From Swiss-Prot:
The gene is mraZ. Gene3D superfamilies: Transcriptional regulator MraZ domain. GO terms for molecular function: DNA-binding transcription factor activity; transcription cis-regulatory region binding. Residues 5-53, 82-125 form the SpoVT-AbrB domain. Belongs to the MraZ family. This is Transcriptional regulator MraZ. InterPro entries: MraZ, MraZ_C, MraZ_dom, MraZ_N, MraZ_sf, SpoVT-AbrB_dom, SpoVT-AbrB_sf. GO terms for biological process: negative regulation of DNA-templated transcription initiation. Keywords: Cytoplasm, DNA-binding, Repeat, Transcription, Transcription regulation. Its main location: cytoplasm. Pfam families: MraZ. It comes from the Bacteria.
Length: 148
């Protein structure tokens, strides 16, 4: 569905242009609506879902018993802190300042198409992740059976 890496520049109002290649698909899948939330696994990164996929993720998470602290924290970070965004006539979305500041996105960002969602990274965090991944040398046994 979504794939690829795109350098993004946010304007002074925190708006970013969604790449043209994705706009038609987003329009068809969710009437130009995206849901923005925090990535609980990586600092410096936000997740963007088309509305329908977000509803699946949200519903799956919200049926979990919140008596467990980790479930409650995930529900708060993912669902409680989510924001519904709509593409404007120029194909832009406005990233809330609270989300931008939490992941240190100022002007420069990187948008990654990750299949069922996008990851929106601060440029610095994305660069650091790439450097760390390349320098680790060992990506773990989980990739041994993957044909690349």
């Amino acid at each position: 569905m979504f794939q690829g890496e795109t350098a993004i520049t946010l304007d002074d109002k925190g708006r970013m242009v969604v790449p043209v290649v994705y706009r038609d698909l987003i329009a068809r899948m969710s009437a130009n609506r995206l849901v923005l939330t925090y990535n609980p696994f990586e600092a410096g990164c936000l997740w963007l879902y088309v509305e329908k996929e977000w509803e699946r993720v949200r519903d799956e998470l919200m049926v979990k018993p919140n008596a467990h602290r980790v479930v409650r924290v995930l529900q708060q970070k993912l669902v409680g802190s989510s924001a519904l965004l709509e593409l404007d006539a120029n194909g832009r979305i406005s990233v809330p300042s609270s989300h931008r500041s939490a992941v240190a996105i100022e002007k420069k960002a990187v948008l990654l198409g990750m299949g069922d969602k996008f990851e929106l990274w601060s440029e610095q965090a994305h660069h650091a992740l790439i450097q760390q991944t390349l320098s680790d040398g060992d990506l773990g046994d989980g990739l041994l059976d993957l044909r690349l």
